[in-house]
């Protein structure tokens, strides 16, 4: 008996295809795809070359990789929510352990006490850093963490329809919130910033009406400026709105007073800065921490500590509010496989660094940013227009288009920053510069020197 003709890598033989077509009542592949317009159909065979050897394949990928611009072969001052920090070598090494190398928490979680313990430790770090009471096991990233916080706030402050978000919250986070709530009937009210780069308190006061269920601000904000938590809390409390703090640069917790100590209800953000490389924008890890009264409204997983029948310490999933565990109508989230492996990386990093190590990273970021900010402001026609206090990121303004200046810097192997106009039209001459502990004094001096030369060339 002859075997049906079949391509080596395609499981369906010609006889199989004919049988399937007959089952659905048509006689050809062309009939199957006749709904596709002819002008977009490929009418010739693809010219695919023959197979490559492993050596040839590796060579091709290496050549392709040389087109990337990275912080290895460029001096990078990119930030805007993704920061190149030092990652201790043992973080990656520990992640490679077979019992950890998965992003999935198991469906019989109590069997995996090691996994649950690592998540519990991660949650403990979050509580200590934010000054709040209860953290969950992680979320997808900073933007979706903010979305979940907004939905949580609406569940708590019922029968209200507006969320006030500072315009200086990462614009991509705000866009994600709009996508989440666009069909839920809620309105996003944005409040701008003043000359110091902080949220305009008068505008915030006017925006906080009785139908606002939450106020969300970011600190350090997208412009790099540290917000006044106390002033914002006072205004939000006047209308009983839930107060949400967003932190996209998580090393700032090493030196900045946490939002929980200033009366905020929820802190969410991006944990990438805790030992996770920038890696093309992901995967990252979102975090959420709330005051105790809100714990039953939290999305995702939560690990608790208890004792087993023999009196030994044990870890369990508790307050499970996912739709897999309770009625869909009562569920607070459908968060499923999240970023447990990346949360483990953050946990390892924070455990290794400790309080003193994290503070040292934060102090270096703060001091080096202040040094570069002063150096750049000393260049003729260059200003740092926002007067508010900053952590490790700040806005630079020149008389020339930011894209042109940054292109000139890139020719010198410097990734000089992010054009602000990509996020805020009308700011075409401004760009955002981020500094971390990886930058040396020589790096900062070189940046200032090359920028000065670029400005001089533009003048001519």
Per-range role (PLM):
Residues 107-111, 115, 123, 127-147:
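Short loop-beta-helix segment that forms the pyridoxal 5′-phosphate
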Residues 387-389, 412-431:
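Conserved PLP cofactor-binding pocket of PLP-dependent enzymes
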């Amino acid at each position: 008996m002859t075997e049906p003709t079949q391509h080596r890598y395609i499981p369906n033989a010609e006889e199989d295809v004919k049988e399937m077509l007959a089952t659905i009542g048509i006689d050809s592949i062309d009939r199957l795809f006749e709904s596709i317009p002819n002008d977009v159909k490929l009418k010739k065979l693809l010219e695919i070359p023959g197979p490559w050897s492993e050596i040839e394949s590796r060579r091709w990928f290496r050549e392709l990789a040389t087109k990337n611009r990275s912080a290895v072969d460029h001096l990078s001052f990119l930030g805007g929510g993704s920061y190149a920090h030092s990652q201790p070598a043992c973080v990656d090494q520990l992640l490679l352990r077979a019992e950890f190398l998965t992003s999935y928490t198991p469906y019989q979680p109590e069997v995996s006490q090691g996994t649950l313990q690592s998540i519990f430790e991660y949650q403990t770090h979050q509580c200590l850093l934010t000054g709040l009471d209860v953290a969950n096991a992680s979320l997808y990233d900073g933007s979706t963490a903010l979305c979940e916080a907004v939905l949580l706030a609406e569940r708590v402050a019922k029968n209200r329809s507006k969320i006030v978000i500072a315009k200086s919250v990462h614009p991509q986070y705000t866009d994600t919130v709009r996508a989440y709530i666009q069909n839920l009937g809620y309105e996003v009210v944005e409040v701008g910033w003043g000359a110091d780069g902080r949220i305009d308190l008068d505008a915030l006061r006017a925006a906080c009406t009785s139908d606002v269920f939450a106020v969300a601000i970011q600190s350090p904000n997208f412009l790099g400026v540290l917000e006044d938590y106390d002033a914002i809390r006072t205004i939000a409390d006047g209308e009983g709105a839930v107060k949400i703090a967003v932190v996209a640069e998580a090393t700032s917790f090493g030196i900045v007073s946490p939002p929980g100590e200033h009366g905020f209800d929820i802190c969410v953000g991006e944990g990438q800065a805790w030992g996770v490389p920038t890696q093309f924008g992901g995967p990252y890890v979102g975090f959420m921490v709330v005051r105790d009264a809100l714990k039953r409204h939290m999305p995702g997983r939560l690990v608790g500590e208890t004792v087993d029948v023999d009196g030994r310490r044990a870890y369990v999933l508790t307050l499970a509010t996912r739709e897999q565990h309770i009625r869909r109508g009562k569920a607070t989230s459908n968060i499923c496989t999240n970023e447990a492996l990346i949360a483990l990386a953050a946990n390892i990093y924070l455990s290794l660094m400790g309080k003193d190590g994290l503070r040292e990273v934060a102090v270096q970021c703060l001091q080096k940013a202040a040094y570069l900010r002063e150096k750049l402001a000393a260049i003729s026609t260059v200003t740092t227009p926002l007067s508010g206090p900053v952590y490790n990121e700040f806005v630079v303004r020149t008389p020339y288009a930011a894209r042109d200046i940054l292109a000139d810097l890139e020719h010198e192997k410097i990734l000089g920053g992010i054009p602000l106009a990509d996020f805020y039209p009308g700011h075409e001459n401004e760009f955002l510069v981020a500094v971390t502990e990886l930058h040396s004094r020589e790096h900062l001096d070189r940046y200032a020197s090359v920028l000065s030369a670029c400005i001089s060339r533009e003048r001519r």
